[in-house]
């Protein structure tokens, strides 16, 4: 166990609750002490939805510790069943309440005798997996549960649809731009003449799950959530799945070609090449932009990428392949899936970092001094501290990355959005000069206020004057190098002479 003030992936119960609260008319009961119940607040604050978060905490308090939990948990399940009439109630412990080692499956079976809806225990090892793994496992478990139930009742629908159709897996609450991605994928499938059979779990009813085998194939746009459910359906019904993330022009085309191959293997005869060509050359602005003079200004610029596997790998490829940007470091916090990430990005970047320690990532960014960072909310904080611009490309994210406007990341419109994000994240060279020339008499003073607040170093008047003569777009780097030079030599007052000496040392 370690104390952290920042976690990239939360504990397992958060993943289970994200899946349960993504479905329509599914309620979750969390068996937990009061400190673990922050999910409701987090989701209510971040997700722009009108409905209350369908999660109830069955609080583990001193009475429960004295008498055992069964009575309270069963009572909470049956009460919520009577009040809300959900189709399914999911019971989940947290890592804290798991210490009690109670037989929760027994509680579920006991509650099921009285409840009208279905009751299920989320079968997740809270000490071994994180939020993303638990979400993937819980989604698979719910799909399995309803396929088995339909089979038992004899109403499982296995007959394929007449036209090619798809199930889209992995869109969840609190996901990165998931709502917009779902809309864009529906549009893309419609353009390809493919019917959307179901989008699971976001907004889906559990009653739809018995019809999942009707689709011709499953699409899993995010590596973190949905893969286990797609693998289960492949084993049970021989349903193929496509797990190529359609982020960026190149990967979107690769995903569409894979879809073409999958549905042609089932008797269709489609050719999506004209569609890919039309979208790439004329409809999407991304390919045109990457050949423009604006993009050539970015060639060779240095960047650091960090996020979940899906988005970090996709952005690394876009930066390196489509925009000619030099990726110094590509990183992920999904340590459990390290091999896949390394295989995806190693040829597109100088170095790969797999870690969930935000301090390690911050140190790497400070050491490398990239022109821009593409990361999570945490990297945004790091960028602000180091005065390096940052584009947010992956969860965990704060409220500004749950946009009201339409901002997908997948498909051809997603490619346009990503191009804007990348281009606007780099500081343009002339910007600082123009600010200095036209910004009024106090501009230089404002710009040099970035001298470290917690610094043990003092800049003399002549040192600051010399620093202000340096062009704005490299001033931050020169300042940091000079301060490092001074610290290494135990110099506390930085004069113009120290600045010259530091420049010579770096030059040498």
From Swiss-Prot:
It catalyses: chlorophyllide a + oxidized 2[4Fe-4S]-[ferredoxin] + 2 ADP + 2 phosphate = protochlorophyllide a + reduced 2[4Fe-4S]-[ferredoxin] + 2 ATP + 2 H2O. InterPro entries: ChlB/BchB/BchZ, LI-POR_suB-like_C, Nase/OxRdtase_comp1, P-CP_red_C, Protochl_reductB, Protochlorophyllide_Rdtase. Pathway: Porphyrin-containing compound metabolism; chlorophyll biosynthesis (light-independent). One of its GO terms (biological process) is photosynthesis, dark reaction. SUPFAM superfamilies: Helical backbone' metal receptor. Binds 1 [4Fe-4S] cluster per heterodimer. The cluster is bound at the heterodimer interface by residues from both subunits. One of its GO terms (molecular function) is oxidoreductase activity, acting on the CH-CH group of donors, iron-sulfur protein as acceptor. Its cofactor is [4Fe-4S] cluster. [4Fe-4S] cluster binds at residue 36. Keywords: 4Fe-4S, ATP-binding, Chlorophyll biosynthesis, Iron, Iron-sulfur, Metal-binding, Nucleotide-binding, Oxidoreductase, Photosynthesis. Substrate binds at residues 429-430. Its EC number is 1.3.7.7. The active site is at 294 (proton donor). Disruption phenotype: Cells lacking this gere are unable to synthesize chlorophyll, accumulating protochlorophyllide in darkness while synthesizing chlorophyll normally in the light. Component of the dark-operative protochlorophyllide reductase (DPOR) that uses Mg-ATP and reduced ferredoxin to reduce ring D of protochlorophyllide (Pchlide) to form chlorophyllide a (Chlide). This reaction is light-independent. The NB-protein (ChlN-ChlB) is the catalytic component of the complex. Belongs to the ChlB/BchB/BchZ family. Protochlorophyllide reductase is composed of three subunits; ChlL, ChlN and ChlB. Forms a heterotetramer of two ChlB and two ChlN subunits. This is Light-independent protochlorophyllide reductase subunit B.
């Amino acid at each position: 166990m370690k104390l952290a003030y920042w976690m990239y992936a939360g504990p397992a119960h958060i993943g289970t609750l994200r899946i349960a609260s993504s479905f329509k008319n599914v309620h979750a009961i969390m068996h937990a002490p009061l400190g673990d119940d922050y999910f409701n607040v987090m989701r209510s604050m971040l997700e722009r939805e009108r409905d209350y978060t369908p999660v109830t905490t069955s609080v583990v308090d001193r009475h429960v510790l004295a008498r055992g939990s069964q009575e309270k948990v069963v009572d909470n399940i049956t009460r919520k069943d009577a009040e809300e009439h959900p189709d399914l109630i999911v019971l989940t412990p947290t890592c804290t309440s798991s210490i009690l080692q109670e037989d929760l499956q027994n509680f579920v079976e006991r509650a099921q005798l009285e409840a009208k809806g279905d009751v299920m225990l989320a079968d997740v090892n809270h000490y071994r997996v994180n939020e993303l793994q638990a979400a993937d496992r819980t989604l698979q478990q719910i799909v399995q549960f309803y396929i088995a139930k339909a089979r038992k009742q004899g109403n499982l629908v296995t007959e394929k649809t007449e036209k090619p159709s798809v199930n889209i897996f992995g869109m969840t609450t609190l996901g990165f731009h998931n709502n917009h991605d779902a809309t864009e994928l529906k549009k893309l499938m419609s353009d390809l003449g493919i019917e959307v059979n179901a989008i699971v779990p976001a907004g889906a009813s559990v009653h739809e799950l018995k019809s999942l085998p009707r689709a011709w194939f499953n699409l899993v746009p995010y590596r973190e959530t949905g893969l286990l459910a797609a693998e289960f359906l492949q084993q049970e019904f021989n349903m193929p799945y496509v797990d190529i993330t359609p982020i960026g022009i190149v990967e979107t085309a690769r995903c569409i070609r894979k879809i073409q191959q999958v549905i042609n293997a089932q008797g269709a005869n489609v050719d999506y090449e004209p569609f890919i060509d039309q979208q790439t050359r004329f409809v999407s602005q991304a390919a045109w932009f990457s050949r423009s003079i604006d993009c050539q200004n970015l060639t060779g610029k240095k960047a650091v990428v960090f996020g979940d596997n899906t988005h970090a790998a996709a952005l690394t490829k876009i930066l390196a392949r489509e925009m000619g940007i030099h990726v110094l470091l590509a990183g992920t916090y999904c340590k459990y899936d390290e091999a896949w990430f390394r295989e995806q990005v190693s040829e597109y970047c100088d170095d790969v970092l797999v870690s969930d320690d935000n301090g390690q990532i911050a140190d790497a960014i400070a050491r490398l001094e990239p022109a821009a960072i593409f990361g999570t909310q945490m990297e945004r904080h790091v960028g602000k501290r180091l005065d390096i611009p940052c584009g947010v490309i992956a969860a965990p994210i704060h409220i500004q990355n749950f946009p009201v406007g339409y901002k997908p990341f997948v498909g051809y419109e997603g490619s346009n959005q990503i191009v804007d994000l990348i281009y606007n994240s780099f500081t343009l060279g002339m910007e600082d000069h123009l600010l200095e020339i036209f910004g009024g008499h106090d501009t230089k003073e404002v710009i040099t206020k970035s001298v470290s607040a917690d610094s043990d170093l003092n800049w003399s008047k002549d040192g600051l004057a010399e620093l202000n003569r340096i062009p704005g777009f490299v001033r931050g780097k020169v300042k940091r190098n000079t301060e490092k030079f001074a610290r290494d030599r135990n110099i506390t007052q930085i004069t113009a002479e120290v600045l010259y000496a530091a420049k010579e040392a770096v030059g040498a």
